[in-house]
Amino acid sequence: VDVFHTAHAQPNDARTPFGKGGLQCESCHGPGGNHAKRVKKGESRPSMIKFGRTADTPVSVQNAMCLGCHEKTAVANWHMGPHDVNSVSCAACHDSHKAKDAVLTRATQPDVCYTCHVAERSQFQKVYAHPVRQGKLACSDCHAPHGTVAQKQLVRATVNDTCYECHAEKRGPMLWEHQ
């Protein structure tokens, strides 16, 4: 199983589900040890927390499980960001059971983002587009998917400041400043 090759399955790291007193899968999926016993007795199984776009577990519950450990890290601005407001689950982008999470890999990240951001895919097919298609740029080079205080989920406070990260020569002074 791939999950045993991920950052979530490190028994020597107390921050991970497998390093927290042996809770393992139940750390994220809730109590499930009695599933088989209850079925044998003719009782219904307690529902398990499931993750992803097609899961029957409410997105708020899915995200609460993830944010229980990750809220203090890269998702400080998650609450009230566009992904939160639009009820996008963490698992819609992240796959914690795979050794290589596609959204964290520069070459595959755009395809994960394009699942929802369909119009952006066509924009990056144009001749004059940034080199996302070629794997030289990822969505997260300019945008902060976990939320930000900047407009358009940018990694810097303004559009210009974000662009200047790569295009310092455009900083000016200019005869007419960019808007």
Which ranges hold each PLM region?
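Short sequence/structural segments immediately N-terminal
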Residues: 1-179
